[in-house]
């Protein structure tokens, strides 16, 4: 028994040593960035080096190629230890690459890599993607900061949920187009989500600014905690949406008409006027309903003009139509009429007298 116990202890000790040696002898790639430069794609790997004073040095290695597999091979030649992708948290695509070259081939390579998780965050950058990695954000490394930034804004702010898996589902699902958050570098220590980029056949065809993300999220996500300013004459109110849901209805086939019902329960956080009453709250609710209806309908018309369908009207109508013809839908989509009806309820307020 003592001999068996000694073997178990020795085996456990050896396993612990082996794992430590493996971790110590590799470079863990936590972020990737891709740009279109000089007719080739430049790939950049972000490697965190943890220093003795508990700070993180963000090291980057870059290589240019036309094949995604060549990036890793060429970057390996620059790295002192083997480079592994199993810890990849975020991938950034430069603006020019996303518009001119497209990103499908790159995304496909990530999807085929069994070491990369499906929950990998993707984003488009304003300007070069590599320059975003050149900053210093937070104390845990740039990749962790950027992935947390995206996750936080999806969970409790205005960015609709998306990742590697959702992007590929939307792309492969006929009648729905993918979208990604857009990241802007402000300075060496700060970045922000500046909007959303929308795709058609793997290329960015449109971008909306951050102040329109609230309305888009209402169209595609069943939960939103975004904040919004509502102007009532000379006064203003700060609204926080704590819960929302939407439902699509096909109300007519000839002509094609889809109605979107959006329900929002909100909290009134702040009011610029002297006194807030129930009557004024009703006016705020009505104003917000009007804003949602107008802005959401503007977005759907915008998407139609760009021939992108991030709301998924094509997929929805297909589910309601026997023998649906997607070739015909390509023509019919531009003539689709969308009516948005909003129902807003302010459930509580800390500023009512």
Segments the model singles out, each with a brief description of its role:
Residues 2-353:
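Membrane-proximal alpha-helical signals and transmembrane carboxylates
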């Amino acid at each position: 028994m003592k001999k068996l116990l000694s073997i178990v202890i020795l085996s456990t000790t050896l396993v612990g040593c082996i794992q430590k040696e493996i971790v110590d002898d590799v470079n863990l790639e936590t972020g990737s960035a891709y740009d279109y430069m000089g007719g080739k794609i430049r790939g950049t790997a972000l490697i965190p080096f943890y220093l003795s004073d508990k700070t993180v040095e963000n090291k980057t290695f870059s290589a240019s190629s036309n094949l995604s597999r060549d990036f890793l091979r060429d970057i390996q030649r620059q790295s002192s230890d083997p480079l592994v992708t199993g810890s990849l948290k975020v991938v950034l695509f430069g603006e020019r690459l996303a518009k001119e070259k497209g990103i499908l081939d790159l995304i496909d390579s990530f999807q085929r890599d069994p070491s990369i998780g499906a929950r990998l965050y993707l984003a488009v950058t304003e300007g070069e993607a590599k320059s975003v990695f050149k900053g210093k954000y937070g104390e845990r490394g740039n990749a962790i900061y950027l992935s947390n930034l995206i996750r936080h804004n999806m969970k409790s702010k205005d960015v609709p949920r998306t990742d590697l898996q959702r992007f590929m589902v939307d792309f492969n699902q006929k009648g729905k187009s993918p979208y990604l958050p857009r990241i802007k570098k402000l300075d060496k220590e700060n970045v922000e989500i500046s909007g959303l980029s929308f795709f058609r056949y793997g290329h960015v065809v449109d971008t909306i600014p951050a102040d329109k993300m609230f309305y888009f999220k209402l169209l595609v996500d069943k939960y939103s905690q975004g904040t919004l300013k509502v102007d009532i004459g000379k006064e203003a109110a700060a609204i926080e949406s704590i819960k929302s849901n939407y439902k699509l209805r096909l109300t007519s086939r000839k002509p094609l008409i889809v109605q979107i019902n959006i329900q929002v329960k909100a909290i009134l956080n702040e009011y610029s006027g002297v006194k807030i009453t129930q009557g004024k709250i009703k006016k705020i609710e009505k104003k917000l309903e009007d804003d949602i209806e107008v802005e959401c309908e503007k977005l759907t018309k915008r998407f139609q003009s760009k021939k992108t369908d991030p709301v998924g009207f094509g997929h929805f109508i297909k589910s309601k139509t026997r023998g649906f013809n997607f070739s015909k839908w390509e023509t019919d989509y531009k003539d689709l009429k969308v009516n948005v009806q909003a129902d807003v309820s302010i459930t509580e307020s800390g500023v009512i007298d």
